[in-house]
């Protein structure tokens, strides 16, 4: 995480760091079955970590009496399926499946291809377009099925088809939903906070609500009248000026809060593969330790509502992707804390993701295991007025 941030979804197991499952754990899940660990020196992860993982895995295999069943294949160069890596992988599979010869030491020079013609020999420093050309001119060598697609086989089903079936079965078996259940599933804890650095300037009251875990929630309040709370996925609260002006004109005292991962609290160390929503890194880091960001955002909104209302219920206005956390907060807070819920341009329901596999989703907008109990839009039925 220090090097480059969280990685692909298949490498992400919710709560894995909380229960001690790391890179070594992936290897040990297979032990004592044969495992070849392939790595490039210039890959995303520091190579020193690869060596540490390989050393510990080798020790574990040795303790299990399967010393020859684990090996490391490393090569110079960046993230890529290099020729030397492919050569060793084929040799490894040959040994395991066809009784081929032993590979020898973990780092074997005979598996590295050397030469002076960089158009023909892999230096380990880049991609190999000649291989792509070979596949184009020899299409038969690149396909196993008659058409080149397993989806053309009789009875073939995609992973999306399987997910839809599982999702429908889970939806049909849902128990009765309660605020307590939502708190438990989303991990919504106490909404404690302290008001820090309050000041007034240009008829706006400014403050920072410091949550119990130290997270700062910047808030700005303007106007007079019945309290309203605005939360948004906007990077700059100034884009909310027309909405705030309309609410103030309607006789509202409006508080705008930057809940975690949005606005002033959005900046992380790394962009998640360049995704425009910077809170993906925050969501994955939370998920690695078993925390859903949606639940934490709901806590932030509950705290901001208590601050904005001063003992009175507030109207909650949620814009964009902030609607998911707002729906959770409104459901568990109820009418004692919220007089209404208005959703401006909210994201689709979670169920829409199963209906259309082309729709993107964000780790930041989902709650782990929640589908077995509810869809996030189920939480809005009593209070909401979507636009």
What are these regions (language model features)?
Residues 1-12, 16, 57:
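Beta-propeller blade termini and top-face loops
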């Amino acid at each position: 995480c220090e090097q480059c941030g969280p990685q692909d979804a298949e490498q992400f197991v919710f709560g894995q760091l909380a229960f001690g499952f790391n890179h070594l754990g992936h290897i040990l899940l297979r032990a004592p079955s044969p495992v070849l660990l392939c790595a490039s020196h210039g890959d995303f992860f520091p190579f020193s970590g690869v060596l540490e993982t390989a050393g510990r895995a080798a020790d574990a295999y040795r303790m299990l009496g399967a010393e020859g069943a684990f090996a490391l294949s490393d090569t110079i160069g960046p993230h890529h399926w290099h020729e030397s890596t492919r050569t060793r992988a084929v040799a490894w599979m040959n040994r395991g499946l066809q009784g081929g010869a032993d590979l020898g030491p973990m780092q074997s020079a005979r598996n590295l291809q050397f030469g002076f013609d960089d158009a023909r020999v892999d230096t380990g420093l880049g991609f190999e377009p000649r291989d792509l050309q070979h596949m184009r001119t020899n299409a038969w060598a690149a396909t196993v099925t008659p058409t080149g697609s397993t989806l053309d086989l009789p009875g073939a089903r995609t992973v999306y088809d399987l997910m839809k079936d599982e999702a429908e079965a889970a939806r049909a078996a849902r128990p009765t939903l309660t605020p307590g259940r939502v708190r438990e599933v989303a991990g919504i804890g106490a909404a404690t906070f302290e008001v820090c650095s309050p000041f007034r300037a240009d008829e706006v009251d400014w403050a920072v609500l410091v949550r119990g875990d130290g997270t700062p929630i910047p808030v700005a309040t303007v106007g007079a009248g019945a309290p309203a709370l605005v939360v948004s996925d906007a990077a700059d609260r100034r884009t909310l000026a027309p909405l705030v002006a309309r609410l103030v004109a309607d006789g509202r005292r409006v508080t705008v809060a930057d809940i975690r991962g949005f606005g002033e609290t959005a900046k992380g160390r790394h962009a998640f593969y360049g995704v425009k929503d910077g809170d993906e890194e925050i969501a994955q880091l939370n998920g690695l330790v078993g925390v859903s960001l949606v639940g934490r955002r709901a806590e932030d909104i509950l705290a901001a509502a208590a601050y904005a209302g001063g003992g009175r219920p507030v109207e909650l206005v949620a814009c964009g992707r902030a609607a998911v956390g707002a729906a959770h907060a409104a459901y568990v807070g109820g009418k004692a804390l919220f007089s209404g819920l208005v959703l401006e341009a909210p994201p689709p329901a979670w169920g829409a993701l199963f209906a259309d596999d082309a729709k993107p989703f964000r780790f930041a907008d989902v709650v782990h295991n929640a589908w077995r109990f509810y869809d996030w839009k189920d939480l809005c039925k009593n209070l909401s007025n979507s636009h």
